[in-house]
Amino acid sequence: MKRSDQRRDAVFALYQHEVTGRPLDELLERAKPFSRQLAEDVEANRAELDELIARHSKGWALERIAPLERSIMRTALFEALHRDDIPVEVAIDEAVELSKEYCGTDAPGFVNGILGAALAERGAAG
């Protein structure tokens, strides 16, 4: 299974966890180690990631952003800021591709804009 597929699995587990309240470990019990670790790390850093997203989503309260888009952005921000083995450009590109495939037509630009602004602020923009 490609890493992009494992990243998608982590994003979907985070999304399901947020929407249904099901325990993350239950949602990830059959997941590959990369997916499991990524989802757990994103959830552990959720407050920091949400604060960054909220600060850069001009005119949008965090709660108004679709849960799947939030999960995609949280994952990309975590990878860009905390994973030295994943280039910032890859984290952003993967997030934009996921939003193109699974979210509304405006989502890719929205996701890209928030990620770009948040990472530029942190000095991590590619």
Residue ranges, per PLM feature:
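N-terminal interaction/assembly modules
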Residues: M1-G126
